[in-house]
Design a protein with these regions (language model features):
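Metal-dependent amide/peptide-bond hydrolase catalytic core
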Residues: 74-212
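Histidine/acidic-residue-rich, glycine-tolerant segments that coordinate divalent metal ions
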Residues: 1-114, 197-198
Length: 212
């Protein structure tokens, strides 16, 4: 329920309605597959999604007297560039991860040192460990650069979804069942996992399950 807002599964789990359920299964439409195809495999199939909003507060001043200000725009720009080093230098090269910034707002006038800046972005990962590291790294780097430039720093995180990690044994059983379904003539057991998130992950964080 309410998958489109990325919060339905959390509410469902929190309500206790799946406490007595041993396993969870889900099927999702995939327009990228030909008719009659079904894809399911064990292991990570969808990435996690966390959304961050960073607020940097400096001190405005006229550009002719920049020494009196603390530039939030320059600071935010440094943060955006530095965040790109996380995947390149802090994540195992054989792992897969994303740190993306999609929004940067700063300043009010062409000749005024920016007092405020806001950055919005997302992190994606296929393991709980990498997800936790990305979150720590974004916070650490942004905070450090803000302090270096004499600016104040705030960050808010929104937990949209954990990674979807299919239980291998159940995925094999699922494949056997699907292979017997009339109309499915192309069972795909190896495919590229998606950086898109799905809140079905909340059902399989603590209990076995499969998402196909």
């Amino acid at each position: 329920p309410a998958e489109e807002i990325g919060a339905g599964a959390k509410q469902f789990v929190a309500s206790g309605k799946i406490d007595n359920i041993d396993e969870s299964f889900a099927i999702h439409v995939n327009s990228g597959l030909p008719v009659g195809s079904f894809a399911v495999e064990g292991g990570p199939v969808n990435a996690s999604c966390d959304i961050f909003k960073i607020k940097i507060t400096g001190k405005s001043a006229h550009v002719g007297r920049t020494h009196l200000g603390h530039d939030a725009l320059v600071t935010a720009s440094e943060v955006v560039v530095a965040l790109q080093t996380i995947v390149a230098r802090e994540v195992n090269p054989i792992d897969r991860a994303v740190v993306g910034v999609g929004k940067l707002n700063a300043g009010t006038r062409y000749n005024i040192v920016a007092n405020d800046a806001e950055i919005e972005g997302t992190i994606r990962a296929f393991s709980h460990e990498t997800r936790a590291h990305l979150k720590e790294a974004v916070t650490r780097i942004a905070k450090g650069i803000a302090e270096l430039n004499r600016c104040e720093f705030e960050i808010d995180w929104y937990d949209a979804a954990a990674p979807v990690i299919n239980t291998p044994e159940l995925a094999e059983e699922f494949q056997k069942v699907v292979s017997k379904v009339e109309g499915i003539d192309n069972l795909i057991t190896k495919y590229e996992s998606s950086m898109g998130a799905d809140d079905f992950a909340d059902y399989v964080v603590n209990k076995p399950g499969v998402y196909g």
